[in-house]
Amino acid sequence: MASLKKSLFLVLLLGFVSVSICEEEKRQEDEDEHEEEGESQEEGSEEKRGLLSVLGSVAKHVLPHVVPVIAEHLG
């Protein structure tokens, strides 16, 4: 009976250890995925900021010349 208890205890202990290792690996994979998602979102926001600054610069230089021409044709 004592050897059965020891064997059962050993099986349970090894089971808990393997479950703990699997949970740790899964947690690490989830953290890696979140970091990758964050990096891709940061790259997307940088692209948007770059595009908006280019559009703003173009509008700043082109609109003063275009608005009077449009006003002439409409008026």
From Swiss-Prot:
Propeptide, chain numbering: 23-49
Tissues with expression: Expressed by the skin parotoid and/or rostral glands.
A single BP term in Gene Ontology: innate immune response
UniProt subcellular location: Secreted
GO cellular component: extracellular region
Signal sequence annotation: 1-22
Assigned keywords, A-Z: Amidation, Amphibian defense peptide, Antibiotic, Antimicrobial, Antiviral defense, Cleavage on pair of basic residues, Immunity, Innate immunity, Secreted, Signal
Residues covered by region (Disordered): 24-49
Domain of life of the organism encoding this protein: Eukaryota
PTMs per UniProt: The major product is Caerin-1.1; in addition, different peptides are produced that are missing some amino acid residues at the N-terminus or C-terminus. Caerin-1.1.1 and Caerin-1.1.4 are inactive.
A family per Pfam: FSAP_sig_propep
Compositional bias ranges of the Acidic residues kind: 30-45
Leucine amide: modified positions: L74
Domain remarks in the Swiss-Prot or TrEMBL record: Contains two amphipathic alpha helix regions separated by a region of less-defined helicity and greater flexibility.
Protein name as catalogued: Caerin-1.1
